[in-house]
């Protein structure tokens, strides 16, 4: 029901407030209050979209503390916001814009909008229908994997679940991908699209079961890298979602050695990590991160497949260094590049980073929220953000 309010000397409905008055009010709102205001009605939503793209599209960080609290950090405002919703019971797996893929204590999957009460219920995990695998729930957090080729079964725990998410708000479409992080089993991915009541199997190539990183691009393709130095591209664009192995793109790459042309203190507590990312044009990037625990110095290097390979490169694809992203920035938590825009606070030639091993989830990894400039080799940290269990950069939609 509309509420009567007084504007000047007139009594009107809040859904009919003139645009110029709304704009003057919206200018004074924080980005969180602006998100709350835009869901009041379609009129307010239209005004917010036309007027304040800057406030709502700057990169934000969602923070997860050790005590279970979930907060938002806006670097431009240098402010931390606490959600009015109780999100402590959820485990966040992935995100696309405002939408987050979450798992509750009963191992139920949902997609939630961080700035509203919208929630999409997803099929249960044990609705998975595979060619070689079936999944049976045997407890609130435990599952039994039945493999047709073996007489025995394997057990999984919800803490080992990994996920990817893509959402198109305009088309009201989404793609959800998940699998259990277990290098000994489950060399297939489970996925579903909007309107489906179960998860289907996306087989990966034999030998790619030890997945080290995954990227979901535009809901059409999944890129996988493995500890065995394989890269695979899976196609989800067909209606049935399954491609034959001959349609998959598989390559084996040669990881670069530690750079020797840049001054960095190497010590026993210094380690390298690798991620993959996909540019807006579809080019795959290999991201090398080097971190020194003694000096807490971190540096990144980008590589891509050699565009002019030697004829002798039959088994391994050589990589060449990338010294610029042009007018793009890399959100490593999502594994994608986005157009840079100083008005939106998205810095060009920059890598937005929190942690390197979302898939592997190694114990030695902890959040290191920073922005690294590829050209100047400078790192910007946010020292006020500490005692965190996890964190994730995202771009509000």
Swiss-Prot record:
The F-box domain, residue ranges: 11-56
CDD domains in the cross-refs: F-box_SF
Gene3D superfamilies per UniProt: 1.20.1280.50
Organism from which the protein derives: Arabidopsis thaliana
Pfam families with a match to the protein in the record: Beta-prop_KIB1-4, F-box
Name of protein: F-box protein At5g25290
PROSITE patterns to which the protein is assigned, alphabetical: FBOX
PANTHER family documented for this protein: F-BOX FAMILY PROTEIN, OS07G0183000 PROTEIN-RELATED
Native organism taxonomy: Eukaryota, Viridiplantae, Streptophyta, Embryophyta, Tracheophyta
């Amino acid at each position: 029901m509309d509420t009567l309010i007084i504007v000047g000397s007139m009594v009107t409905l809040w859904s009919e407030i003139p645009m110029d008055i709304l704009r003057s009010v919206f200018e004074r709102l924080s980005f969180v209050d602006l998100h709350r205001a835009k869901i009041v009605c379609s009129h307010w939503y239209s005004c917010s979209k036309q007027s304040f793209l800057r406030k709502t599209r700057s990169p934000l960080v969602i923070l997860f503390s050790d005590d279970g609290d979930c907060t938002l950090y806006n670097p431009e405002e240098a402010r931390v916001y606490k959600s009015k919703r109780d999100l402590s019971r959820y485990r966040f797996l992935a995100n696309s814009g405002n939408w987050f893929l979450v798992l509750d204590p009963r191992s139920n999957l949902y997609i939630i909008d961080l700035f509203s009460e919208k929630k999409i219920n997803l099929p249960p995990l044990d609705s998975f229908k595979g060619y070689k695998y079936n999944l049976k729930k045997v407890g609130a957090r435990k599952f039994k994997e039945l493999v047709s080729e073996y007489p025995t079964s394997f057990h999984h725990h919800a803490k080992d679940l990994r996920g990817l998410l893509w959402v198109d708000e305009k088309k009201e479409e989404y793609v959800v991908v998940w699998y259990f992080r277990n290098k000994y089993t489950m060399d297939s991915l489970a996925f579903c699209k909007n309107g489906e009541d179960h998860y289907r199997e996306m087989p990966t190539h034999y030998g790619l079961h030890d997945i080290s990183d995954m990227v979901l691009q535009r809901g059409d393709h999944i890129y996988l890298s493995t500890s065995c130095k394989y890269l695979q591209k899976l196609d989800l664009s067909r209606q049935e979602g399954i491609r034959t192995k001959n349609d998959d793109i598989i390559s084996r790459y040669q990881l670069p050695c530690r750079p020797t042309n840049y001054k960095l203190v190497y010590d026993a507590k210094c380690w390298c990590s690798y991620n993959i990312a996909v540019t807006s044009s579809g080019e795959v990037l290999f991201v090398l991160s080097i971190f020194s625990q003694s000096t807490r110095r971190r540096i990144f290097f980008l590589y891509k497949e050699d565009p002019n390979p030697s004829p002798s490169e039959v088994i391994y694809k050589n990589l060449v260094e990338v010294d610029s992203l042009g007018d793009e920035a890399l959100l490593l938590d999502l594994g994608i590049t986005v157009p840079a825009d100083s008005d939106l606070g998205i810095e060009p030639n920059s890598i937005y980073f929190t942690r390197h091993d979302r898939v592997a989830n190694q114990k030695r990894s902890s959040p290191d929220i920073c922005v690294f400039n590829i050209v100047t080799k400078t790192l910007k940290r946010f020292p006020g953000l500490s005692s965190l269990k996890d964190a994730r950069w995202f771009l509000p939609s």
